[in-house]
């Protein structure tokens, strides 16, 4: 245990600028993600993402929305777009919502709702523009320049599923109703998960209903071991939420994106669900494991066989330069599935992609959402394009795919 605690401290030092942190813009100057010359057009245009109109809110008997980061009545604007994102969480709500959000870091019962995120028209692909700070003082967010959480509204389970089904129907139509569920990783807060889901959906032009599940991470780089316990404890509720979305959303295709430590609860939940209700997991069109912090041996022995039986198109994004996964090795004494330093893991039914060359930003643990090359590839998976038809991928000597970045 002493070795693990020392390694966890090393992990904290390695993650000071990673793991779900949004990008500050230093008072209006956003960090610009370098565009990648496109080898093919993106899978869908940005206008496909649903915008919110204040005159037509989702009907609910839940408490009124809590406005944060901006005026109480957001409306259509030439300076920003509004994106509706749905959520499930087992975070305990705060008695008095404050600057840190409506939900804290303690576990609670499963609850549901929707958030409205503003995306500035000056948004750079892959970046979550947020205010900077100087000498400990945070600057107020400006929706013309920053992502802001405009509304958060609690919904009942029935209201959530009705709203998700309606949005998927409007965006895709019969036979093309899509739902995308994001499960965040270590050291990520509720608001950051909402921003990442909105940003990813906006950047890939997702036509459907985007959702996220937020488990009660401690939101502290020193709490790696404690976060591992939290994600394990959250597995039953993650399974319940995924099951409810798969069935209740009436989506024709469900795409699940899990990142980092969040992959532990996600794949364990799906493995159980595949045994209990195989008809549900049959509706999952794609499972994306981004930098998964799961021991590779455990995945091989316990998870991969069940995923094969599910016949779900699974994609692994891995790297040899992910600092967090390198530190995870020191904590756990075993290579993570997303760590390619001992070779990339390959399994039947899973497309393994070495994303080390996605750029130096991949050293940041949340780069799966920040790299334009990775976003383009994720968008192609959502669109159903197989690896052989994605020209930025090539076969490596070990048979795995390599994500190339044209500079």
Residue map of PLM features:
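Sec-dependent bacterial lipoprotein signal peptides
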Residues: 1-17
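Bacterial signal peptide processing site
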Residues: 19-23
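Alpha/beta-hydrolase fold active-site loops
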Residues: 178
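The conserved beta1-alpha1 loop
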Residues: 181-185, 259, 291
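Short substrate-entry loop that stabilizes the transition state in hydrolases
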Residues: 188-193
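Short, low-complexity, disordered segments immediately C-terminal to signal peptides
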Residues: 24-37
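Lipolytic serine-hydrolase domain surface
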Residues: 45-168, 173-174, 194-253, 270-286, ...
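Gly/Ala-rich beta-loop-alpha elbow adjacent to hydrolase catalytic centers
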Residues: 238, 258-262, 266, 271
